[in-house]
From Swiss-Prot:
Belongs to the STPG1 family. The keyword Repeat applies. Keywords: Apoptosis, Cytoplasm, Nucleus, Phosphoprotein, Repeat. Pfam families: SHIPPO-rpt (PF07004). The keyword Translocase does not apply. STPGR repeats lie at residues 67-74, 109-117, 148-155, 187-206, 225-257, 267-282, 306-316. GO terms for cellular component: mitochondrion; nucleus. The modification Phosphotyrosine is found at Y72. Residues 29-42 have a biased composition (Polar residues). This is O(6)-methylguanine-induced apoptosis 2. GO terms for biological process: positive regulation of apoptotic process; positive regulation of mitochondrial membrane permeability involved in apoptotic process. It is found in: Cytoplasm; Nucleus.
Length: 334
């Protein structure tokens, strides 16, 4: 048994009995555990057990091989591959003679062309931020930038314009320019230019289509009613004259045709029928089988001869006695 245990320790293997779970009663003395495990003791240094005013470094500086900002060289390579298998004439019906990806000219400096201040490059110890030790003043004077302020530089117009890189040789080539349009620098102010009246006036009566519409598109409808100031309130309405039949009527079975009466003039102000909306009209409307004749509206206003609600003097009837006579009748006592 001792030799086998030594062999297992040398080879790094656990004994067979230790890997199996033992069942049953075990004594209370220290024995070898039935389940293998790996124990790892964690050692806490004394520097981390300190509470306030701890001088332990929170951010230790680790050295690695990764270069910092501004310490590497960027090489811009063309993404277009010069492979022999690619056809120079293209693969479409009308091949283009220009490159698909133009050379990109960067307008900004490269990553290693910046001048970074030394304050940003220098490493600081942030572990002393909450300590009671003496520290250097953290507020420093702002650096004066050498770049121009707004409205103090002339932006190049050539960079803002759109470049015309259309160099295709298609079968149906468009003659429309793809670049920016040239606008006039100075234009006439409002009211100082001539409008082409041919666009405003009615078009001539020429054949434009098979079924041309004759409806006017720009004319306003004339009003059929009278305008303001046309009414005369003092003038009375004229009664149309009756048409007289001729003296020698023609012998017909039907009566003589009479002309239509003329249209009455439009009513002026004050000639309309004004409806009294204060008193609503009474309409007894009901859908029941027994229609009630009781008015559902407010009562009529009181007349001047009727008494008011406080002019009555009601008399309470007193007690009265009755006698029961021989005829079995009740007789009131006087």
């Amino acid at each position: 048994m001792d030799n086998s245990a030594q062999k297992n320790e040398r080879t790094g293997k656990h004994p067979r009995r230790a890997s199996e779970v033992q069942k049953g009663f075990t004594a209370a003395y220290p024995t070898q555990s039935s389940i293998p495990f790996k124990s790892q003791a964690s050692v806490i240094p004394e520097s981390e057990k300190k509470g306030f005013n701890s001088q332990a470094k929170r951010f230790p500086h680790k050295k690695n091989d990764i270069p910092g900002p501004g310490f590497y060289n960027v090489i811009h390579q063309s993404p277009v591959s010069n492979s022999v298998s690619l056809s120079k004439k293209g693969t479409c019906m009308f091949p283009s003679m220009c490159a698909r990806l133009d050379t990109i000219i960067s307008k900004y400096p490269a990553a290693n062309a910046y001048t970074i201040p030394s304050d940003f490059i220098s490493k600081r110890d942030f572990s002393n931020s909450c300590s009671s030790m003496f520290q250097l003043p953290s507020f420093m004077k702002a650096l004066k930038f050498e770049t121009p302020a707004p409205n103090y530089y002339n932006a190049s117009v050539s960079c803002c314009k759109q470049r015309n890189n259309v160099c295709t040789r298609a079968g149906f080539m468009s003659k429309t320019q793809r670049g920016s349009f040239a606008f006039a620098d100075k234009g006439p102010p409002p009211g100082h230019y001539d409008i082409n009246e041919s666009l405003v006036k009615q078009s001539p009566n020429t054949l434009m289509s098979c079924f041309k519409s004759k409806t006017n598109r720009g004319l306003k409808l004339t009003s059929t009613g009278p305008g303001p100031g046309y009414y005369n309130p003092s003038d009375c309405t004229k009664v149309p004259k009756k048409t007289l039949f001729p003296k020698n009527p023609i012998l017909n079975f039907s009566a003589q045709p009479s002309p239509l009466p003329p249209k009455p003039p439009f009513p002026g102000p004050g000639q309309y029928e004004i409806v009294d909306y204060l008193g609503p009209r009474k309409h007894f409307i009901s859908s029941a089988s027994f229609v009630s004749n009781t008015s559902r509206w407010t009562a009529a206003p009181p007349q001047p001869g009727l008494p008011g609600p406080a002019t009555y003097k009601p008399e309470l009837p007193g007690k009265q006695s009755f006698l029961y006579n021989e005829d079995k009748k009740w007789i009131p006592v006087l």
